């Protein structure tokens, strides 16, 4: 409420928000029993502007276009153009479907996504970046920890609970969220033969996931844990939640290559050696019928109509990942050293050597951080206790032979050392 008393006059008016008098501001806008000054209006505008900016890209109908989505993905994920295009179109269509569902009699079905690619090629990062662009609740689940309801392990409904927690229990927002299920290749059917024992972490989990992926009203205990009769449940409709499943699918390339062997017939036919092509190249030839042979049940494959395959990251792509994205590893370590007042430099040869080590380890982009930690560990340990260090240079020898990075001292320190000697 505005204060009606002032130091110079009883009629002086004050801003109800910051308390400044009408003489201290340019304008004071009156409302029913309240006043707001021009400075507070400006502040409110800034807050609204920031909030609007943080909600990500929005086109005329509230959904970013596929090109806009792909452009933002390019800032964070290097390469994988085909996968980015597939994801951009699928996500755009999914949220366009939600925004226009009541405007027509034609019911548009949901298109969940399956990402297939080698370890460290960017599957998880793609899903995380999508959620950031769209400003929707996002959660990740590890398929290896899931079991059928009633067995030791996590129920599939715990995934929805995590999504609820990510949205601070806003059920309406949850029902437009994104769930990324990692390691989905680890819940494949253990055997083609019927077994006396129940497969609770393989086919059983696939069966349990079918319902929430297709769309059901899940009863989720608000505080987590096991369900009990006296507990109140939150009802969450999963019909409009977008599910993205990802996995390395090691061994799937052999099934694809085996299927392709029959195509080379006759004396002039070209028969390619499967080993001559990379895993990512073989994944490009994937057909939906290859997945049941790998161990996914046909009903589960049917719930994932959009399939995007990712390729192996080559040496050039790994060097780009180290230096170019917004959160590039080199930029992160340079910032750490900058806090100590030291410049960190990597030579071109050093970056190439790091990329080669990651390829040799077969860990993709995921292995880059551990390699960087190994190289810089001793330097980061000693640096806070050293005086006069101006720059740290990581060269090829530091990567390949375990030599310490070069330390460059300031001129003042050099002169002091010369005087002391």
Curated annotation (Swiss-Prot):
Keywords: ATP-binding, Chaperone, Metal-binding, Nucleotide-binding, Zinc. ATP binds at residues 118-125. SUPFAM superfamilies: Glucocorticoid receptor-like (DNA-binding domain), P-loop containing nucleoside triphosphate hydrolases. The keyword Transmembrane does not apply. One of its GO terms (molecular function) is ATP binding. Zn(2+) binds at residues 15, 18, 37, 40. PROSITE patterns: CLPX_ZB. InterPro entries: AAA+_ATPase, ATP-dep_Clp_protease_ClpX, ATPase_AAA_core, Clp_ATPase_C, Clp_protease_ATP-bd_su_ClpX, ClpX_bact, P-loop_NTPase, Znf_CppX_C4. Gene3D superfamilies: 1.10.8.60, ClpX chaperone, C4-type zinc finger domain, P-loop containing nucleotide triphosphate hydrolases. Residues 3-56 form the ClpX-type ZB domain. GO terms for cellular component: HslUV protease complex. One of its GO terms (biological process) is cell division. Belongs to the ClpX chaperone family. Component of the ClpX-ClpP complex. Forms a hexameric ring that, in the presence of ATP, binds to fourteen ClpP subunits assembled into a disk-like structure with a central cavity, resembling the structure of eukaryotic proteasomes. ATP-dependent specificity component of the Clp protease. It directs the protease to specific substrates. Can perform chaperone functions in the absence of ClpP. This is ATP-dependent Clp protease ATP-binding subunit ClpX. It comes from Cereibacter sphaeroides (strain ATCC 17023 / DSM 158 / JCM 6121 / CCUG 31486 / LMG 2827 / NBRC 12203 / NCIMB 8253 / ATH 2.4.1.).
């Amino acid at each position: 409420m505005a204060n009606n008393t002032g130091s110079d006059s009883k009629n002086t008016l004050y801003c109800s928000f910051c308390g400044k008098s009408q003489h201290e501001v340019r304008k004071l806008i009156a409302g029913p029993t309240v006043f707001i000054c021009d400075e507070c209006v400006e502040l409110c505008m800034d807050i609204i502007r920031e909030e609007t900016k943080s909600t990500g890209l929005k086109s005329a109908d509230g959904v970013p276009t596929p090109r806009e989505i792909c452009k933002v993905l390019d800032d964070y994920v290097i390469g994988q153009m085909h996968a980015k295009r597939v994801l951009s179109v699928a996500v755009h269509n999914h949220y366009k479907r939600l925004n226009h569902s009541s405007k027509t009699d034609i019911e548009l079905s949901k298109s969940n996504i399956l990402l297939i690619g080698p370890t460290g090629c960017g599957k998880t990062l793609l899903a995380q970046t999508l959620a950031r662009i769209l400003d929707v609740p996002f959660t990740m689940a590890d398929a290896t920890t899931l079991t059928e309801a009633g067995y030791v392990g996590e129920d599939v409904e715990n995934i929805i609970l995590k999504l609820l927690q990510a949205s601070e229990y806003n059920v309406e927002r949850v029902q437009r969220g994104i769930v990324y299920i990692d390691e989905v290749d680890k819940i494949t059917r253990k055997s083609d033969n019927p077994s006396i024992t129940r497969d609770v972490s393989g086919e059983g989990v696939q069966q349990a996931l079918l319902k929430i992926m297709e769309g059901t009203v899940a009863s989720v205990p608000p505080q987590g844990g096991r369900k009990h009769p006296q507990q109140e449940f939150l009802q969450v409709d999963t019909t409009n939640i977008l599910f993205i499943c990802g996995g390395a699918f090691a061994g799937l390339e052999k099934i694809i290559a085996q299927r392709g062997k029959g195509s080379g017939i006759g004396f002039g036919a070209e028969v390619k050696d499967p080993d001559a092509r990379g895993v990512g190249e073989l994944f490009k030839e994937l057909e939906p019928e290859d997945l049941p042979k790998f161990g996914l049940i046909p009903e589960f494959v049917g719930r994932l109509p959009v399939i995007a395959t990712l390729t192996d990251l080559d040496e050039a792509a790994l060097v780009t990942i180290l230096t170019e994205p917004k959160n590039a590893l080199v930029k992160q370590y340079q910032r750490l050293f900058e806090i100590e007042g030291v410049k960190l430099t990597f030579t071109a040869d050093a970056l190439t050597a790091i990329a080669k080590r990651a390829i040799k380890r077969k860990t993709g982009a995921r292995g880059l951080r551990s390699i960087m930690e190994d190289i810089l560990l001793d330097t980061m340990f000693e640096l806070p206790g050293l005086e006069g260090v101006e720059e740290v240079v990581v060269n090829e020898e530091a990567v390949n032979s375990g030599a310490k990075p070069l330390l460059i001292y300031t001129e003042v320190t050099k002169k002091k050392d010369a005087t002391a000697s």
